[in-house]
């Protein structure tokens, strides 16, 4: 058994746990490692495919990539994702929105390192290799207006430029010549979900807005409720919620979580929490599975807990 476990790369400490620990702990250790290894393998495959597709041909250039999408859907997706772009570009590429063109979907990503928004759209037609392009955030407004005015659009990206094309007009998109952080890595490294909360989006947003001046707001899940309180205060507000999994506590800067709620769609929002209070929390629109935000919580010792 030792040779088999070493053959799959299981760390020595985990091998000892499997061999010497109780069966329940051994199973949990192996399942956790399998999830991590699967994520790493997926990331490696996607990264190598992206790099291979981006390699130049014998003439030193790569073919343009085009995808055809619905204009109103593209406008909606850009409106949702772009608020996560950095307002102060200490890392210039974060002042942009990543458009990842693929064979089956167009994925849009923006982040300021404290929260990330990701939305995918199905494509009707595609040609050329998978290709990323980073569009300047201050050009997104014009792109939204252009997309909303056309039923179908072709997004064309070459080595030199990016263009939105309708049947009779086109819009050039200013791009940033920099590598966007790997959102695949972020998604692959998310910890296992230990609890899930479905809560009224408007009520949660209202309470967060009321507490917007606080350094941190603590959220605690219960059997059928979500409690909110200012960190350091024993009193708070209880909201009705549908909760599954463990009872969990985490804390956020109100403005960060509020930003994720503002761009969500539908009457309810879904929070997916890990057992580790300082790990990222996934925020989803309960009725829109193609849009995801990831919000970094506050370390409560840093917030004065």
What is each stretch, according to the model?
Residues 177-181:
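Short, structured "edge-of-domain" segments at secondary-structure transitions
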Residues 183-188:
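Short acidic (Asp/Glu) and glycine-rich catalytic loops that position anionic groups and cofactors
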Residues 1, 7, 13-117, 126-176, ...:
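DNA polymerase processivity clamps
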């Amino acid at each position: 058994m030792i040779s088999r476990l070493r053959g799959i790369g299981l760390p020595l400490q985990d091998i000892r746990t499997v061999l010497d620990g109780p069966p329940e702990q051994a199973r949990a250790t192996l399942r956790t490692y399998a999830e991590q290894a699967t994520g790493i393998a997926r990331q490696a495959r996607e990264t190598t495919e992206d790099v291979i597709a981006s390699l130049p041909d014998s003439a030193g250039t790569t073919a343009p990539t085009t995808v055809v999408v619905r204009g109103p859907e593209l406008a909606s997706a850009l409106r949702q994702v772009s608020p996560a772009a950095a307002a102060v570009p200490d890392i210039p590429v974060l002042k942009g929105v990543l458009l990842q063109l693929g064979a089956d979907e167009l994925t849009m990503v923006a982040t300021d390192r404290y929260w990330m928004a990701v939305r995918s759209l199905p494509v009707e037609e595609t040609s050329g290799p998978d290709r990323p392009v980073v569009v300047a955030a201050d050009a997104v407004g014009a792109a939204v207006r252009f997309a909303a005015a056309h039923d179908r659009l072709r997004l064309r990206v070459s080595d030199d430029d990016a263009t939105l094309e309708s049947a009779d007009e086109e819009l050039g998109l200013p791009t940033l010549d920099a590598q966007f952080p790997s959102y695949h890595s972020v998604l692959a490294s998310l910890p296992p979900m230990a609890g899930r909360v479905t809560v009224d989006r408007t009520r949660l947003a209202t309470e967060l807005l009321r507490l917007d001046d606080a350094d941190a707001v603590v959220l605690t899940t219960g059997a059928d409720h979500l409690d909110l309180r200012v960190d350091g205060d024993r009193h708070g507000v209880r909201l009705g919620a549908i909760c599954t999994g463990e009872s969990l506590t985490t804390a956020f800067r109100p403005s960060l979580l509020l930003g994720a709620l503002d761009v969500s769609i539908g009457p309810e929002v879904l929070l997916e929490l890990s057992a580790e209070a300082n790990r990222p929390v996934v925020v989803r629109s309960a009725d829109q599975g193609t849009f995801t935000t990831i919000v970094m919580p506050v370390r409560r010792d840093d917030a004065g807990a």
